[in-house]
Amino acid sequence: MKFISLKSRGGNYLVVAENVAWLRAHQNDQTQVGVIGGAPILVAGSIEDIAATILAG
């Protein structure tokens, strides 16, 4: 199980990389991250930056 750190304006998240289901661009250079079995989280950064972070794992 590989955790990735995602930064948010309200705090930071540690997410299991394999549980990320989808990414959606949001306003103000933020991205929604869909997590299997949970509600989406809103993180800081463009969709490309978040995708690169997840793939680098």
Regions found by a protein language model. Give the residues of each.
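Acidic, Ser/Thr- and proline-rich intrinsically disordered linker/docking segments
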Residues: 1-57
